[in-house]
């Protein structure tokens, strides 16, 4: 089986994968879930990509790299420096080469759901429950609230993406059909128009590793074995 590296997004730390990881280990996959730095306000895309790269064993040959939400933005930088089996964008953002993230937002189409604008789920419990954990069981939602972070993305948002050529690597995109943060319509569009792939859909909110870990593990395991 392959090594699956799970990269958390901007609102939860690496503990967010604790329900998913055991399901991926059942068929024999090895799992990594690196922690991105939350105490580096000047961190840009290259810094986050370096953290991911440094977490990968040098001798690992069949690496499936999965990123959730904002961290999808860093995957091409990793793939440009390390041979990978495939990239999996899980309800994730993608960079537009030659543009900053803010440039991409202005150019459209709309990436985020309108009601998500200005919300801070780290400080606002109601926002976290409504936008991130609305389809989780009460027990899981209570635990998930303890994993909240805010990843510094100021430089990521304003810098021109530091890559001039998209890496040659197989890619897949998982759309969360009940997502209340990242627009499912945008996710479907970006999968087809930017990655050139048919999106895979899960009937879940933004965090299916919490609400549907068994289903998500099945999808990821299949991708890790067939790509």
Predicted segment positions?
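Short beta-strand/loop motif that positions the catalytic acidic residue
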Residues: 173-175
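Flexible "cap/lid" loop of the alpha/beta hydrolase fold
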Residues: 80-125, 155-161, 183-184
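Active-site nucleophile elbow and catalytic-triad environment of alpha/beta-hydrolase enzymes
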Residues: 146-165, 169
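Post-His helix in hydrolase/transferase enzymes
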Residues: 48, 210-224
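Conserved loop-alpha-helix segment in the C-terminal half of the alpha/beta-hydrolase fold
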Residues: 177-203, 210, 222-223
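Gly/Ala-rich beta-loop-alpha elbow adjacent to hydrolase catalytic centers
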Residues: 66-71, 75
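Conserved HGGG/HGGXW glycine-rich cap/lid loop of the alpha/beta-hydrolase fold
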Residues: 2-41, 61
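Active-site loop/oxyanion-hole signature of alpha/beta-hydrolase fold enzymes
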Residues: 30-64, 101-110
């Amino acid at each position: 089986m392959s090594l699956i590296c799970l990269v958390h997004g901007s609102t939860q730390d690496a503990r967010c994968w604790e329900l998913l990881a055991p399901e991926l280990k059942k068929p024999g996959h090895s799992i990594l879930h690196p922690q991105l730095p939350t105490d580096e306000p000047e961190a840009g895309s290259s810094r986050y990509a370096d953290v991911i790269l440094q977490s990968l064993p040098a001798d690992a040959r069949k690496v499936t790299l999965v990123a959730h939400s904002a961290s999808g933005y860093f995957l091409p930088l990793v793939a440009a420096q390390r041979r990978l089996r495939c990239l999996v964008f899980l309800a994730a953002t993608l960079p537009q080469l030659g543009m900053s993230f803010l440039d991409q937002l202005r150019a459209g189409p709309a990436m985020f759901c309108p009601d998500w604008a200005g919300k801070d789920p780290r400080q606002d419990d109601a926002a976290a429950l409504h936008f991130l954990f609305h389809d989780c069981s009460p027990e899981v939602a209570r635990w998930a609230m303890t994993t909240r972070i805010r990843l510094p993305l100021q430089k990521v948002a304003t810098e021109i993406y530091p890559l001039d050529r998209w890496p040659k690597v197989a890619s897949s995109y998982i759309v969360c059909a009940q997502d209340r943060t990242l627009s499912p319509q945008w996710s479907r569009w970006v999968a087809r128009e930017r990655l050139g792939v048919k999106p895979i859909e899960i009937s879940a909110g933004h965090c299916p590793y919490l609400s549907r870990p068994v289903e998500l593990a099945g999808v990821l395991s299949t991708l890790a074995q067939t790509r």
